[in-house]
Amino acid sequence: MSFDIAKYPTLALVDSTQELRLLPKESLPKLCDELRRYLLDSVSRSSGHFASGLGTVELTVALHYVYNTPFDQLIWDVGHQAYPHKILTGRRDKIGTIRQKGGLHPFPWRGESEYDVLSVGHSSTSISAGIGIAVAAEKEGKNRRTVCVIGDGAITAGMAFEAMNHAGDIRPDMLVVLNDNEMSISENVGALNNHLAQLLSGKLYSSLREGGKKVFSGVPPIKELLKRTEEHIKGMVVPGTLFEELGFNYIGPVDGHDVLGLITTLKNMRDLKGPQFLHIMTKKGRGYEPAEKDPITFHAVPKFDPSSGCLPKSSGGLPSYSKIFGDWLCETAAKDNKLMAITPAMREGSGMVEFSRKFPDRYFDVAIAEQHAVTFAAGLAIGGYKPIVAIYSTFLQRAYDQVLHDVAIQKLPVLFAIDRAGIVGADGQTHQGAFDLSYLRCIPEMVIMTPSDENECRQMLYTGYHYNDGPSAVRYPRGNAVGVELTPLEKLPIGKGIVKRRGEKLAILNFGTLMPEAAKVAESLNATLVDMRFVKPLDETLILEMAASHEALVTVEENAIMGGAGSGVNEVLMAHRKPVPVLNIGLPDFFIPQGTQEEMRAELGLDAAGMEAKIKAWLA
C-alpha cells in the first residue's frame, strides 16, 4: 500500500524526530493538519485503531519537538494513541501495514524501533515502567529525560495510582502527561487557564516556590500559611489536588490541540525537578467529524470510505460468540433477578450493550480494574447474588490472585465468561488468549468448560451459572459461531465428554471451537472424534476408554500446549500407567504475533490441513 506523499508537503519533510526539530515552530500547525489527514488516509485503507490517534496528533508533535527523542525516553500507555508517534519516527511509509501479518506492530514495540521504549498493549503500565526508567536514567547521569503518556481510562487502574504513590515517595525526575479525551473540552480549558498553566510551569514561579520553601523552612507557621495560600489559589482553577497530594507538581488542564501552547508548557516543565504532571484535554477522533461524534465506534475500524462517514455494516451472517453470550445473559437475567454482570471496561467487546440497557441496575462496568472486578464479584456471591464476570482471556491474567484467593479458596459461585480465548488476530502478542486453560487448570475447585459451538456455549454458560459448589469458567473465541441449531437450555453433566464419531486406531480428543477442523481430520483419517467439553474436571473414564481402544491419541486445543488441556490428558494416562502415545496439538511455546486468525492458524498448523500433516508426520 503506497501513499502520495506529495499531498502532504510538510509531513514529507519529516521521517525522523531530528527532521521534525529542524522545522520552524510556525509550521507545526500545518504539520499537525497533514499528519491527521495522513492518519485518516492510511487507517481507512488498512484498518486499525483510529480515534485515539486523531486526538493525540498535537501532543505527539509537541513531545518530539521539545524532547530529544530517542535519547529522551517517551513511553505510551496501551498504545492505541501511538500511530502518529510511529509516523513521525521513521515508520511513515509502512503505516499502511500496521496490525497485518509481517507488518508494523499494532502497539509500540521495543523490537521495532529505538523510539519505542516500552512494549505495550495492556493498560496502566506506563508510569510504573517510567519510574524505573527514570531511576535508571538518574543513575546513568546523562540528563536523560523520561515522559509517560497515559489516558483518562488507563489512569483509573490501581496500578497507575500505586506507581504515582511510589513516585511521590522517591521523587524521580519525570513527566506524566494525562491525555484526558472526554467528549468535550473542559470548561476550565480556555485562555485564562492556558495562561495559568504556562505561568505555573514557568521558571520564575518554580524559582519563587522553591526559594520560598528554603527561606521559610525554619518558620513552620509561615511555611504552612504559604502552602495553604498556594493550594487555595491553584484550587480555584486547577483540578489537580489529588495528584499534588500524591507528590506531583500538577499543571493543567490545558488545550491538547494547541500545539504551540503545548510546546511552551513542555519547555517550561522539561527542566523541573521531581515528578511533574501535565493534564491535557483532547477530543478523541479530532478532525474527523464522524469519529468525534462516535469515538467508541471509531475506536478501532475496518477498512472504510472516509467520504461516507460510515463504517461498513455487518454482512448479517452468523452471530459472534460475544453476541451469543450477550443474548444468553439477557435471557437469563429476565428469569433471575439475582444475576449480576460485571465487565472491566469491555461492554461493547463482550456483547453487553443490550444487557446494560435492559438491566442497568444489575450491570457494573468497573473500568480498567480487573482485580477489583473479580473480588467485587466475590462480594456479590457472598451476599447471595449470582455474579458473572465477562472478561477477555488476556485481561483475566491481571486478576489471577483474586481468582485464587478471593473466589476459588472460598468456593464462591462466580461464573467467568472468558471471551477472546485462543488466537485473536491483529492485536498480536499482548492480546492472544493463549494461556487461560494453563493458568486456570491448576486452581482447585474450578470447573472449566470449552464449547465446540454456539449451542454448547449456551449450555455451558447455563451449567456454570447453576453450579453452586465453586467458580466456573467458559472460554470462547473471538469471531463468529458455526451455525448450529440452538436447543433449549439444560445443565450438562459436570466432567463428561461425548463421542462424536467412531473410528479406528486413532482417537482425537478435541477441546473447544477447533472442532470443525478436527472433524475434517477425523473424517480423512477415519479417527474417533471426542468432544471433551470439560478441561476440569476431565472425563478420566472416557480418556482411559479411548486409550484402551486405540493405538494413539491426539489432543487438540487453542491454548498453549504447556500446561493446557492436553497436558491434563497426559497426566491422567501417566497416573493410570497407560503408555499410549499422545500427540498434543495447540499453541507452541512462543508469543504469537499479529495476523488474521485464519493466517495464524494456518501458520501454526491449527487448520485441518496443518493438523493432518502433523498427525501423519508423527505417525510415520
Curated annotation (Swiss-Prot):
Example of a GO cellular component annotation carried by this entry: cytosol
Catalytic activity entry: D-glyceraldehyde 3-phosphate + pyruvate + H(+) = 1-deoxy-D-xylulose 5-phosphate + CO2
SUPFAM superfamilies: Thiamin diphosphate-binding fold (THDP-binding) (SSF52518), TK C-terminal domain-like (SSF52922)
Gene Ontology MF, one: magnesium ion binding
Binding-site residues for Mg(2+), renumbered to this chain: D152, N181
EC number(s) given by UniProt: 2.2.1.7
Single biological process term from Gene Ontology: terpenoid biosynthetic process
Cofactor binding summary note: Binds 1 Mg(2+) ion per subunit. Binds 1 thiamine pyrophosphate per subunit.
Pathway: Metabolic intermediate biosynthesis; 1-deoxy-D-xylulose 5-phosphate biosynthesis; 1-deoxy-D-xylulose 5-phosphate from D-glyceraldehyde 3-phosphate and pyruvate: step 1/1
Coiled-coil region: none
The UniProt record lists the keyword Nucleotide-binding: no
Names of the cofactor(s): Mg(2+); thiamine diphosphate
Keywords: Isoprene biosynthesis, Magnesium, Metal-binding, Thiamine biosynthesis, Thiamine pyrophosphate, Transferase
List of residues binding thiamine diphosphate: H80, G121, H122, S123, G153, A154, N181, Y288, E370
CDD domains: TPP_DXS, TPP_PYR_DXS_TK_like
UniProt keyword Protein biosynthesis, yes or no: no
Subunit structure: Homodimer.
Function: Catalyzes the acyloin condensation reaction between C atoms 2 and 3 of pyruvate and glyceraldehyde 3-phosphate to yield 1-deoxy-D-xylulose-5-phosphate (DXP).
Family under the similarity heading: Belongs to the transketolase family. DXPS subfamily.
Protein name: 1-deoxy-D-xylulose-5-phosphate synthase
